[in-house]
């Protein structure tokens, strides 16, 4: 990704650099696209009539400044992100009354626009006449550029405006006189591209160019190709500025006019300064030129508000000559006219006007129509208009008054003292330059241009460079990295995986309907087709309700048929023969009756009704096990732990092909007097009889204690029924767990229901059965599903249909159930066949829903190997990366005055070192080789201390200081919905459950002493743990009444103590 960002930045810079010549030639400047577009939008919103007026001007063909503003804004908003908009009056041959209206609208609404520009808006305007705005330059900068304008200068610029109120409003604007100015009204001080480098390199460039001209002046073969002819007539001297042929090809017209106008303005200003020093001004002999709609300087300069009387010390005899100066501009040409109104005593005279234009040929035409060629290189010396006075006026009776431009350039800054060189009439012959000199001059011209434009790219102002870097980084990281790689990439993956998802708002509806992820639609089909519990009958009417997830291989296929919402929570399982199914449906339970639960301060039992796998005959493949009603979670394994006495008694089979049962119990010296046992009475009774005679489901008045819980396995004999039912109703076993209803405190009971079908009818010590599935003596099994942690069981119907069932094997350990379940929301999960890393785990839900993506959560647990020899097995292999059990004890004390960190473990069955797993997509950018430590949590989850620290209660920062461990520290939090509790969390990183039981701290037991939510730590100071026993507490679940799909925010302000509302 970093490489892509770098390439994008390089590409972006190259694009800008490739267009830098175009940008510079158009006198455009870099500006933020967001500011510019927002400014334009607000401008047009504030001036809708201006927008409409601009359309009318474009339709009428008036290429005035308003139309240029309108068209250029629309073009740049559509195509460019970075630009500076410069509006030039391309054609001023029309009446500009509408332009004046546009200027009023623009200035009137400018205070409304300026606050939305997100930065100082430098608005520079050349007001060259009283009724027309000739140039409007909108420039956006990342920093302020103070032109040092005074109120008097601003008033001088605004004074010709016909709207005095508007001028006063602009002058008195508070923004105008602060450091962060939004509005500037001043004359253009820098021409073209040199505006960008004025702050840094303008002076240096000017000196270098001046030095270059001085060198060229001394070269005899590179004399300026400047030729003038003797003036033989009286009349008008006109300077005609025409396009250079190359300029017409490479430069757009609006740039040409902008450059010409600004340059001519600067030149004429200097001319007027010279004229005013030599002429006597008279105010009563002015002759305006109303027919010329051009650069009307009469109202701009005081010198042109009066007649210009010729006079001075140059030997001219008459003092009554008047001179009028005006401009006339068309789309292609600009004419500069100096008219001698009354020249009775002037035989000849001329004014040489070197008009400085970049990359153009300035042709000076006098009344004799003799051309004068001026090199375009002269433009390069214009680096500051206000410090360059390079035009001189030379007159002499009956001779041409002229000088070389090099002489004028050499006298920059001192035009009044430079002495021109006069030519005689014989010298005034046309002299064409040689071809080699022209080629060399063009070559030098291109070299200078390349040097200067290269300097522009390098020597930009720091503010502009900073803006460019910041904007490019924002574009790269936000537009490219975030939008392209994250948003679009993930969206594309999601679009491929989840093409058909029907969802509603979980907060409004209460649950989400999904065709694939949840089982509401599937369960509805079950209801329609007769799918029901506790009723004798064939639930699979058309043989497809249990085939939501079918694999390609019969050993790994699973059929899911969920009958209710049963939280299996902290039950255990093994790793062998895991399935590859993905995204099972989730049952939505609308409500329950009132149930009497066990108080949280008391011990609860793990009630498990499973059929353990009987590894009869010690074969590798024991086919499919018989239906067993055993409650012994140790099943056929001798799980041995420290100071525990797990008894297991083999019971003879009543009938070889009917029932295989095991009677297992946990004789651990628990406080209660009841074992986890099997009630076989219901096996010989019909379902209806048991329900009518034994169950009392309607008495809700009294409370129950530990012995009032009834666990019945209901079923029916199937010895003879299998011979007749065939397709309609093969023998089935229905297991019912009934709660005696009542009001009272709610405890937690974990009920795991599993039903099996006896396919293992082999007669000898063989590995596979060959005849049992073809005798129509079995029925499709139904069972719960734990994704990725189940044993696939093969079931064959008589009709030949393959249906897979999920069988859960449970292995108990001594105490403390570590979890590595897959009960997490907001996770994109792909279950694969793998080891389950966790000896004791929790089954949160039968069906897990994955909704939101972009959160990587690992729910891998681990357990011991599934071995062939069932008589001598110890669950010794653990779940850490290097192989050991996942039992850790973390202790956090209550007070935090003098807290220290103990780097040793209280009791650990894991390896000493193991690598951290990347559980959350490397959000914290940290992977370390860490220890499993015992924390003295006085400092609230601080892993190390230096001295006596005081730590606020809720000041927890999830940064690199919070190190995430593997499943040895399996603490997580689950978003609670209704009465579904959020599991305990330590720093809120992993998404794995952590079971906590309350016991006395004695020797010989493994007790976890930390309880915590997202930001608070809950400590059980008084615990109760006995010696040499195995007791499983499940203080972490409740009935799931609204576990549809709603998300609720965890309580972060919960008090740091254990309450009955801990769910």
Curated annotation (Swiss-Prot):
InterPro entries registered for this protein in UniProt: Glutamate_DH_NAD-spec (IPR019651)
Q: How is its activity regulated?
A: Allosterically activated by NADP(+).
**MF terms (GO), sorted A to Z:** glutamate dehydrogenase (NAD+) activity
EC number of this enzyme:
1.4.1.2
| Known catalytic reactions | L-glutamate + NAD(+) + H2O = 2-oxoglutarate + NH4(+) + NADH + H(+)
Keywords, alphabetical: Allosteric enzyme, NAD, Oxidoreductase
Please indicate which superkingdom the organism of origin belongs to.
Eukaryota
Q: Which family does it belong to?
A: Belongs to the Glu/Leu/Phe/Val dehydrogenases family. Highly divergent.
Indicate the quaternary assembly: Homotetramer.
- Put simply, this protein is called NAD-specific glutamate dehydrogenase
Can you name the source organism?
Achlya klebsiana
């Amino acid at each position: 990704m970093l490489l892509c960002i770098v390439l994008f930045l390089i590409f972006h810079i190259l694009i800008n650099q490739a267009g830098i010549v175009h940008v510079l030639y158009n006198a455009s400047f870099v500006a933020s696209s967001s500011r510019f577009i927002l400014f334009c939008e607000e401008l047009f919103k504030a001036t809708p009539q201006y927008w409409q007026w601009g359309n009318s001007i474009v339709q009428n063909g008036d290429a005035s400044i308003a139309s240029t503003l309108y068209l250029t804004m629309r073009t740049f908003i559509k195509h460019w992100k970075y630009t500076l908009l410069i509006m030039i009056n391309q054609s001023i041959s029309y009446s500009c009354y509408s332009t004046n209206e546009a200027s009023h609208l623009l200035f009137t609404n400018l205070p409304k626009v300026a606050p939305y520009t997100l930065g100082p808006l430098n608005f520079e305007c050349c007001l060259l006449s009283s009724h027309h705005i000739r140039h409007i330059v909108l420039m956006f900068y990342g920093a302020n550029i103070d032109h040092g304008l005074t109120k008097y200068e601003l008033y001088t610029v605004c004074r010709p405006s016909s709207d005095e109120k508007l001028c006063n409003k602009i002058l008195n604007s508070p923004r105008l006189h602060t450091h962060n100015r939004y509005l500037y009204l001043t004359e253009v001080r820098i021409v073209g591209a040199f505006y960008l480098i004025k702050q840094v390199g303008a002076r240096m460039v000017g000196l270098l160019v001046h030095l270059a001209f001085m060198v060229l002046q001394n070269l005899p073969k590179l004399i300026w190709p400047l030729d003038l002819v003797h003036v033989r007539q009286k009349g008008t001297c006109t300077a005609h500025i025409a396009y250079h042929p190359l300029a017409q090809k490479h430069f757009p017209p609006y740039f040409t006019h902008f450059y010409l106008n600004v340059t001519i303005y600067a030149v004429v200003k200097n001319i007027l300064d010279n004229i005013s020093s030599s002429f006597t001004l008279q105010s009563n002999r002015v002759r305006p030129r109303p027919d010329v709609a051009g650069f009307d300087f009469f109202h701009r300069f005081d010198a042109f508000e009066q007649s210009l009387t010729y006079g001075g010390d140059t030997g001219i005899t008459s003092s009554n000559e008047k001179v009028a100066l005006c401009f006339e501009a068309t789309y292609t040409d600009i004419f500069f006219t100096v008219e001698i109104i009354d020249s009775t005593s002037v035989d000849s005279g001329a004014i040489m006007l070197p008009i400085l234009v970049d990359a153009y040929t300035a042709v000076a035409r006098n009344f004799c129509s003799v051309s004068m060629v001026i090199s375009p290189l002269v433009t390069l010396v214009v680096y500051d208009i206000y410090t360059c006075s390079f035009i001189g006026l030379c007159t002499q009776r009956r001779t041409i008054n002229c000088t070389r431009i090099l002489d004028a350039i050499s006298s920059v800054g001192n035009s009044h003292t430079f002495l021109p060189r006069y030519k005689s009439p014989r010298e005034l012959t046309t002299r064409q330059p040689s071809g080699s000199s022209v080629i060399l001059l063009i070559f030098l011209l291109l070299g200078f241009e390349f040097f200067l434009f290269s300097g522009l790219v390098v020597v930009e102002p720091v503010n502009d460079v900073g803006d460019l870097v910041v904007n490019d980084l924002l574009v790269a990281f936000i537009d490219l990295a975030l939008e392209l790689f994250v948003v679009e990439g993930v969206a594309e993956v999601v679009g491929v995986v989840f093409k058909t998802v029907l969802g509603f708002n979980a907060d409004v509806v209460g649950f989400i309907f999904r065709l694939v992820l949840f089982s509401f639609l599937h369960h509805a089909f079950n209801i329609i087709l007769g799918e029901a519990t506790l009723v004798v009958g064939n639930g699979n009417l058309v043989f497809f309700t249990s085939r939501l997830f079918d694999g390609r291989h019969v050993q790994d296929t699973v059929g899911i048929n969920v009958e209710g919402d049963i939280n299996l929570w902290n039950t255990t399982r093994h790793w062998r023969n895991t399935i590859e199914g993905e995204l099972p449906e989730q049952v939505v339970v609308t409500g329950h009756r009132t149930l009497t639960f066990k108080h949280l301060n008391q011990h609860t039992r793990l009630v498990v009704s499973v059929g353990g796998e009987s590894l009869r005959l010690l074969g590798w493949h024991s086919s499919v096990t018989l239906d067993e009603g055993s409650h012994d979670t140790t099943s056929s394994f001798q799980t041995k732990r420290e100071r525990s006495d797990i008894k297991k008694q083999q019971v003879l089979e009543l009938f070889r092909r009917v029932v295989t049962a095991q009677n297992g119990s946990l004789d651990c010296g628990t406080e209660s007097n009841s074992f986890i046992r099997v009630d076989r009475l219901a096996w010989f009774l019909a379902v209806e009889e048991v329900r009518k005679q034994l169950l009392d489901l309607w008495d809700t008045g009294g409370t129950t204690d530990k012995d009032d819980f009834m666990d019945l396995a209901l079923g029916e004999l199937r010895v003879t029924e299998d011979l007749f039912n065939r397709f309609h109703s093969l023998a089935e076993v229905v297991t019912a767990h009934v709660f005696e209803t009542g009001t009272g405190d709610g405890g937690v009971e974990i009920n795991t229901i599993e039903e099996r079908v006896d396919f293992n009818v082999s007669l000898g010590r063989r590995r596979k059965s060959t005849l049992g599935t073809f005798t129509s003596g079995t029925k499709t099994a139904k069972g719960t599903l734990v994704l990725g942690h189940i044993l696939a069981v093969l079931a064959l119907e008589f009709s030949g249909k393959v249906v897979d069932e999920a069988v859960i094997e449970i292995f108990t350990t001594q105490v403390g159930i570590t979890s590595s379940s897959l009960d997490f929301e907001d996770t994109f999960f792909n279950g694969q066949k793998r080891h389950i890393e966790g000896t004791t785990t929790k089954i949160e839900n039968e069906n897990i829903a994955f909704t939101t993506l972009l959160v990587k959560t690992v729910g891998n647990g681990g357990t011991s190997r599934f071995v062939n020899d069932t008589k001598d097995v110890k669950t010794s292999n653990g779940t850490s990366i290097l192989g050991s059990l996942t039992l850790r004890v973390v202790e956090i004390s209550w007070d935090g005055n003098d807290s220290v960190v103990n780097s040793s473990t209280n009791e650990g069955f894991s390896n000493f070192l193991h690598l951290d797993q990347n559980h959350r997509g490397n959000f914290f950018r940290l992977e370390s080789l860490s220890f499993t430590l015992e924390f003295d949590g006085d400092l609230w989850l601080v892993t190390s201390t230096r001295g006596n620290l005081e730590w606020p209660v809720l000041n927890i920062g999830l940064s690199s200081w919070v190190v995430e461990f593997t499943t040895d520290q399996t603490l997580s939090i689950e978003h609670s919905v209704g009465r579904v509790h959020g599991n305990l969390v330590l720093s809120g990183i992993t998404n794995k459950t952590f079971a906590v039981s309350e016991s006395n701290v004695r020797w010989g037991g493994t007790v976890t002493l930390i309880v915590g939510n997202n930001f608070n730590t809950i400590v059980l100071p008084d615990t109760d743990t006995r010696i040499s026993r195995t007791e499983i507490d499940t203080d972490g679940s409740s009935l799931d009444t609204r576990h549809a799909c709603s998300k609720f925010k965890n309580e972060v302000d919960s008090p740091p103590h254990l309450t009955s509302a801990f769910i």
